[in-house]
Design a protein with these regions (language model features):
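Short, well-ordered surface patches within globular domains
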Residues: 98
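Short, low-complexity interaction segments enriched in Ser/Thr/Pro/Gly
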Residues: 3-4, 19-21
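Bacterial N-terminal signal peptides
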Residues: 10-19
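Extracytoplasmic cell-surface/polysaccharide-interacting catalytic and binding patches
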Residues: 21-90, 102-186, 194-219
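Segments that shape or occlude catalytic/ligand-binding pockets
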Residues: 95
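Bacterial N-terminal signal peptides that target proteins for export
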Residues: 2-10
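Conserved metal-phosphate-binding beta-hairpin within the catalytic cores
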Residues: 191
Length: 219
């Protein structure tokens, strides 16, 4: 599960990303699993396991991100494989139309980004993912909460979990941080590439600057 195989996957991922960038500069997103098939994908908004309790994505929707984000995810996956764990992606690129539906269903200004304010959700720019851990058999492991949890258990610094859950969360956060992601204090599963602002148009970058840091980001 580790050693030379991880290096091969990392090389393939980087090569795939470079080809994607060079092949079509006008199409900024790549399929995470086309870059690294070992990363598990379970898009929660393609099913009912989300806070609106019904699908928002059509069946067959792929997990898309910026090519640079896909390369960083492969780095995180390589780190986790050394410890017999791996990534599962719950969400990646999210169309503004879906973000609008989430906002209309919630109107929770503390947790859900209004797509018409500032930069909206960073998912809509392909620079953020929602991720959790799986074991070496791609089975889910214990984490502080499920996806789209608005209770204190979703907080990154929540202290009510067991030692095993804390260990899993620390491992996920460490691997993602090492790969170049920032976490979100209100959603342990949400990660944004640290240099996300450079992928936004100038006007959006100005809005992001006025909006604040990544710690104030929302779903």
């Amino acid at each position: 599960m580790h050693g030379p195989h991880n290096k091969i996957w990392l090389f393939i991922a980087l090569a795939t990303v470079l080809m994607a960038i060079n092949a079509n500069a006008d199409c900024p997103f790549v399929d995470i699993q086309s870059v690294n098939p070992t990363i598990v994908v379970e898009l929660r908004y393609a099913g009912t396991k989300n806070f609106v309790n019904h699908p928002l994505y059509p069946q067959g929707t792929r997990a898309l991100v910026r090519p640079e984000v896909a390369a960083a995810l492969t780095k995180a996956q390589t780190t986790l494989r050394r410890y017999q764990y791996g990534l599962k992606i719950w969400d990646a690129y999210r169309p503004v139309s879906v973000q609008t539906k989430l906002w209309e269903a919630s109107r929770n200004i503390d947790h859900v980004a209004n797509p018409e304010v500032g930069v909206g959700s960073l998912h809509s720019w392909g620079v953020a993912v929602d991720a959790t851990l799986v074991d070496s058999w791609n089975r889910p492991v214990s984490m502080p909460s499920d996806f789209d949890d608005f209770t204190p258990a979703a907080m990154w610094r929540y202290t009510g979990s067991s030692f095993e859950v804390h260990r899993h969360l620390r491992l996920l956060h460490w691997a993602m941080d090492r790969a170049g992601f920032w976490g979100m204090r209100t959603e342990w599963w949400h990660y944004t590439i640290s240099d996300w602002k450079k992928f936004l148009p100038e006007e959006a970058r100005q809005s992001a600057h006025l909006q604040g840091t990544h710690w104030k980001g929302k779903l």
